[in-house]
């Protein structure tokens, strides 16, 4: 039996366990937020399904689905500090990318790019939290 872990937790563990990477001089300066992303939970209104998982009066999970019922976008506040810190991007219902604010400063510092929703193709990280990507690890595509 295969047990699946929540994607965010498993991917963060993989990133922190990984060594090496590409030097900052070879990386783009920053990655801007997508137009739909917001750290403020109040921004998730029209078109979003929201949930207050700990009943504190603040939304800490938001998901947008398409007409077929597939996820399109997702945002979560895992530490429940009132700000979204984990963002998921789907294409045709398959997870393509995850962006994480790992130190909860309302700035993305980990980017994870996936293939087929489960295989990590590449990850990037801002290790000193200055808004500039410092490390990148890219993995080759395996024959399927």
Annotate each PLM feature:
Residues 3-4, 18-22:
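N-terminal targeting/docking segments
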Residues 20-144:
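Calcium-binding acidic motifs and repeat modules
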Residues 1-9:
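Bacterial N-terminal signal peptides that target proteins for export
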